[in-house]
Amino acid sequence: MPSIINASVPGSEANTSEINYMSDDPAQTANEKIYPKDKGYAWVIMIACFFNLGFSLGAVNSIGVFQTHYLKVMFATVPAEMIAWISTASITTTLSCGIFANMIASRLGIRNTAMLGSLIGCLGLLLASFSTKIWQLVLTQGVIFGFGSSILINISLSVLPQWFDKHRSFAMGLIASGGGFGALFLIPIITKMLEVSSFAWAIRVLLIVYALIAGISSFLVKPRIPNTGTTISFDYKVLSDPTIILLSLIGGFIQIGTSIAILYFPASIIDLGYNPTLATNLIMVFSVFSACSRLTSGYLTKKINAVNILIFANFVTSIIFMALWYNSKTMGTSLTFYILFGIFGAPYFAVQPIIVSANYKYEQISSINGVVFLIMGLAILIAVPSIGKVFQTLGNRKDYNQIITIAALSFFIATIFSIFLRYSLLKKQVTSNRNKNSN
């Protein structure tokens, strides 16, 4: 049976070359050059989108370093469920607010919107560097920085498919790996600054790096097809699409399980008797394997059905949580879990945008990604504070088994929904082929 990801759907990647989805900067005109796909400036777009995701999602993936600092140093006497609101706000806003990117870009243009996102992100980090209370960090590091990053992420995921056809799977896999490589770059910087200086200067150094990289990358982003004055609003039809609903549910449950590992694994290493520096440095190990997994998953979708990758990866992840991290008392077992989690827990973040770009019209991509990420963000909003409460009351801030069980169940539920997704896409493909034959 042919792979669903390569199925030809009317209006999908094979038929989007002349769709003007988001307007470019107002200064551009319809007389400007239309760039070719898969070559030339397309590679500049890919690199720019890679860095946008790298330093937006990379900063979010580095939240585990700050979470450990909050739990063990900065807010050591504050209940864990209160501290969890910082990471909750950061992850939730970063994921969910991208739904506004389409509406902003239709008025300001892609480049201006991307630059606005990077500017808002910089403002959030600047204000966070002066914050000393939890509510201040929720607002600055969480909401303001998260909103700016969400705009960059949505723009990058939505504009790239317009530039690639033949090499789309590779390009999407590469930018999806950006968050892992970004975290690999940022984590040692943040960790070192927390050691030798202060929290405030750790944030300020992050601000300098983010402003430089995201600012340049945002300026380089533009649509392949020049502005013709078209304004595209949110496509509400995607809200009732079974495939989109399933993708959103899968993402939501995966995000719950992922957040537990990202936020609590470093702290669990400290509780085994190791120092905080080693614990946070292990996040880099995770980031390497996660980034490579996302890049590889994107490439594998050309050979293996994308949903089959999801089913297998989600099921394996649910097993390793219980087999390796649950009740772990040794560094070897815990590290093995973290490495395998980086490999098998990451494919969704690479194959989800590939599935969307292969099965839907280009002008729907931003709306679909916005909905999927919104559900993922809402899942974090509901789950992370609850997980913090479980860790505080049932685990007494020392026992991780209860939240590990929650993570394992989340990935198992995602496995079930992934099976439903496969049948949904099969049905979609059969319907599409039937319509073609009838015409």
Predicted feature locations:
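A late C-terminal transmembrane helix in Major Facilitator Superfamily
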Residues: 359-397, 407
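Hydrophobic core of transmembrane alpha-helices in multi-pass small-molecule transporters
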Residues: 50, 54, 124-125, 135-151, ...
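Cytosolic juxtamembrane N-terminal segment immediately preceding the first transmembrane helix
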Residues: 2-57, 220-237
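C-terminal transmembrane helical hairpin of 12-TM major facilitator-type secondary transporters
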Residues: 272-274, 278, 286-290, 294, ...
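C-terminal ends and interior cores of transmembrane alpha-helices
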Residues: 119-132, 218, 315-329
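Intracellular juxtamembrane helix-capping segments at the cytosolic ends
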Residues: 70, 142, 149-164, 171-172, ...
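Extracytoplasmic gate region of multi-pass secondary transporters
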Residues: 55, 59-70, 187, 241-301, ...
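Helix-to-loop junctions at the C-terminal end of transmembrane segments
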Residues: 97-110, 293-306, 391-392
